[in-house]
Amino acid sequence: YEFKQYFPENGWVEHNPNEIWSTTLKALKQVINKAKKLKGNILTIGITNQRETTILWNKKTGKPIYNAIVWQDRRTQDYCKLLKKKNYENSFRNKTGLFIDPYFSATKIKWILDNGKISKKLLGSNDLLFGTVDTFLIWKLTKGKQHLTEASNASRTMLYNINNNKWDKEILKKLNIPQKILPEVKNSADNFGKTDKKITGVEISISAVLGDQQSAAFGQTCFEKGSIKSTYGTGAFVIMNTGPKKINSKNKLLTTIYYRLNNKNTYALEGSIFIAGAGVQWLRDKVNLIKKASETETISKSSKINDGVFVVPAFSGMGAPYWRPDARGVITGLTRDSDWKSIVRATVESVGYQSFDLFDSMNKDGLKPRIIKAVSYTHLTLPTNTTV
């Protein structure tokens, strides 16, 4: 089920948490009803989710105090610049594996705390909670009994120390974020409670949680050190399993937790591209060059050569390996021979060029992939001359 995206200001991206919850519950009930018809039982469920997307809600009522600020959102760009001027980047990166960027949850939390109408009141009464989408869904499914997350999601907040597996008190202090609003961090496979019977009709245990990109790598069986998955959806994300050893990239890739089992981390290197399928959405919904996403494949294959038109889809800044939140989109190479199809093709090709940058960074870090597994959840078949 698709839910609406909101763009209240330039560079801002939001979701309605209640829509996230209602569509999730609708999908779950559909599966439960199907299982009943087949006379089967659902033994357990797992959750995979957008990782950095940030929600704060009222502990007593369960109502969000602001819309979910989505991972693509850029509103905290100036605050991130301030943190960099204070020379926090190296310290933050050594602890969290991340660069200071609006992409991650920490500065989004800070923004809601500073701008939410009832943030201070709820903090004072200990009635304010934070969570990424997994935490919010667990809270709702268990009817407020569990305030939990797991390691792969926690590692994307820019608040979690991936060396000692704890919320980092020094970073929290520097950002003035109270630890009491943060969830407990569990293993990726663990006891996350049970769904409330009044909500789902049956009690079902929740026994696994994993961030969406880590989950995609797990689903592609990237269990061996050096195995890579490259996923193309709204954004595009390349993850390499680096095993139990944390590797720090010299070429601006992220060091992150792949998963944690039995209190032991498996780490990964990740390159994040903010605009992949979202570029196709832009072609369809904003500039109206196509009516359906599927048209991009036919158009991209209609010509064997690029006619010199290039799109830099920095609609939400640039992710790895550039980390330029201030970057903006560019179309270049237009001539009188160029037409709308040139722009469509160039937008699709841009995903291939960005992917090359990520693989090139891994190569420069001296990391040789054992195998690359690519999967697309959108219409992003690259033209024949686009080499990754």
Predicted regions and their residues:
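Short linear loop/turn motifs
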Residues: 182-191, 297-301
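N-terminal glycine/serine-rich phosphate-binding loop of ATP-dependent small-molecule kinases
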Residues: 1-66, 94, 184, 200-208
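Short beta-strand-loop/turn "lid" adjacent to the catalytic site in phosphate-handling enzymes
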Residues: 35-71, 99-105, 134, 138-161, ...
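N-terminally biased helix-coil "hinge/interface" segments that flank
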Residues: 1-2, 20, 24, 28, ...
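Short, acidic/turn-prone active-site loops that include or flank metal/cofactor-
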Residues: 1, 6, 69-76, 235-236
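Short, conserved phosphate/pyrophosphate- and ester-handling motifs at nucleotide-, phospho-/glycolipid
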Residues: 16, 73, 212
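Active-site core segments that coordinate phosphate-bearing ligands/cofactors
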Residues: 77, 84-98, 103-147, 158-169, ...
